[in-house]
Design a protein with these regions (language model features):
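Gly/Pro/Ser/Thr-rich low-complexity, intrinsically disordered segments predominantly at protein N-termini
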Residues: 1-201
Length: 201
């Protein structure tokens, strides 16, 4: 099935979406990703294949800063592990997602087999961050944050440098919106973690 797109040589618009539920299973998608490592792809729970364009330089810089700050905290805290945007997770609803930044509790990570750790981990991270770029429409990102929470994330942040807002999602609560904050606290979910948002604006 992966040979439909491999080798791939075509031009697609940013965040190109095509419904493949009738021709591509989750396992087919996993193989497609392995066969095309140069592409960043996701698969929705309803079978939509999403081809995502590379980030611009400014967005890449912001992503690196997010990973640096969360990674520094995680190295000291040692209660979990951090992943960058190249990591694909298989969520309980069947979606394949690659959050910009994510964190998984150490006990959940250690409970995976070696094969699961080496492949696409079958879990939803405990904490995720998505960073909006100028080309991103906001509603699909908001839907993605709700999906993370519905699949087991304890907290999810949507950071919008365009509007200088941070949306905080938690289970069984409406999203909290912070307007132009200087810092955002991890509170109980990530005790001691405080993101310096000024580095992202």
């Amino acid at each position: 099935m992966a040979t439909i797109f491999s080798p791939i040589d075509m031009h697609v618009p940013p965040n190109f979406i095509v419904d493949v539920h009738s021709v591509l299973t989750g396992e087919d998608f996993d193989q497609l990703v392995r066969d095309n490592p140069e592409l960043r792809m996701e698969l929705s729970a309803t079978g939509e294949l999403i081809l995502m364009s590379p980030t611009g330089s400014k967005t890449g810089l912001r992503n690196a800063e997010l990973n640096r700050q969360l990674g520094n905290w995680a190295k000291t805290n040692r209660s979990g592990v951090v992943f960058d945007s190249s990591t694909l997770f298989v969520l309980p609803n069947g979606a394949r997602r690659s959050p910009d930044v994510s964190w998984v509790k150490l006990e959940r990570w250690n409970a995976l087999s070696v094969e699961e750790q080496e492949g696409f981990a079958p879990l939803c991270p405990d904490f995720v961050i998505e960073l909006r770029s100028r080309s991103d429409n906001l509603p699909p990102l908001e839907d993605k944050m709700l999906e993370y929470i519905a699949n087991g994330a304890q907290m999810a942040w949507l950071i919008d440098p365009v509007r200088k807002r941070v949306y905080i999602y938690r289970p069984n609560r409406t999203a909290e919106i912070l307007e132009d904050p200087q810092t955002v606290s991890g509170d109980l979910e990530l005790a001691g973690f405080k993101l310096d948002v000024r580095e992202l604006w």
